[in-house]
């Protein structure tokens, strides 16, 4: 009898577009996860897949946007939490550019529903409770506010208030939430897109790039410690470390770089499910 599996999709900004290659590989295998857990970009892509979109449909949606910069800019304008001039204010409190909930409305496929209960695959979303200093696990109720909370990167996106909790990006506490899937399937698969270390780059990043890179470094450290204390059954790592967190307009290049992960996933997952 074939075993069931659950899928954890990690955070990492634009690198998370590599998750699409993983979903395409599952479609090619004819396999669907029993449950999905996601953080940040992993939550967004996981929601689209859980809503019934195929990996290829998600790819088409992303590439259509990435190849139309005017449309991307138009949608970004609609997500503003304030004026773009606020970016240059000294107080970070007024420097937030994007309303995370508006972002989800603008940049998610129309097929993504309003409520967790309408999804075809159970989905768990990770955000961070800013004042309780712990992760927030969201799996029922309104879907898009939960997604917004999971991607609400401080200084870039406004925090989201849910049930009297102030929530920010889930990557601050749990960038790869595989442990949330234990006991929900026979096999747990985690997709880590934090990127391998590199000694090749020597360029000095600008302040925003440095901030975002720091978040990724911290997330990588959190994930490494979690794996030490109890690894999932399978971890796959698309080779997308050369891309920066905001390289969304390089979607085609990210997807090309992620393509080799398909063969690895198919071979290793098939062995686990049939073993």
Regions found by a protein language model. Name each.
Residues 1-39, 47-275:
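Patatin-like phospholipase
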């Amino acid at each position: 009898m074939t075993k069931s599996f659950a899928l954890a999709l990690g955070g990492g900004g634009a690198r998370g577009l590599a998750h699409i290659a993983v979903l395409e590989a599952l479609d090619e295998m004819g396999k669907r996860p029993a449950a999905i857990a996601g953080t940040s970009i992993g939550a967004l892509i996981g929601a689209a897949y859980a809503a019934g979109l195929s990996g290829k449909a998600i790819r088409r949606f992303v590439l259509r946007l990435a190849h139309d910069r005017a449309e991307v800019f138009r949608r970004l304008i609609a997500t503003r939490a304030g004026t773009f001039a606020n970016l240059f204010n000294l107080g970070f409190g007024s420097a937030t550019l994007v309303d995370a909930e508006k972002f989800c409305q603008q940049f998610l496929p129309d097929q993504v529903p309003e409520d967790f209960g309408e999804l075809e695959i159970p989905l768990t979303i990770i955000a961070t409770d800013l004042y309780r200093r712990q992760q927030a696990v969201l799996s029922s109720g309104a879907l898009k506010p939960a997604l917004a909370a999971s991607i609400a990167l401080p200084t870039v996106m406004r925090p989201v208030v849910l049930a009297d909790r102030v929530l920010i990006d889930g990557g601050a506490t749990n960038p790869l939430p595989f442990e949330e899937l234990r006991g929900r399937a026979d096999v747990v698969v985690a997709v880590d897109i934090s990127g391998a270390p590199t000694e090749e780059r020597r360029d000095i990043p600008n302040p925003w790039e440095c901030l975002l890179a720091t978040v990724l470094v911290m997330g990588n450290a959190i994930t490494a410690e979690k794996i030490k204390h109890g690894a999932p059954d399978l971890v796959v790592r698309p080779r997308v470390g050369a891309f920066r967190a905001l390289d969304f307009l390089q979607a085609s290049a990210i997807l090309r770089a992620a393509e080799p992960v398909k063969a690895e996933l198919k071979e290793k997952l098939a062995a686990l499910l049939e073993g």
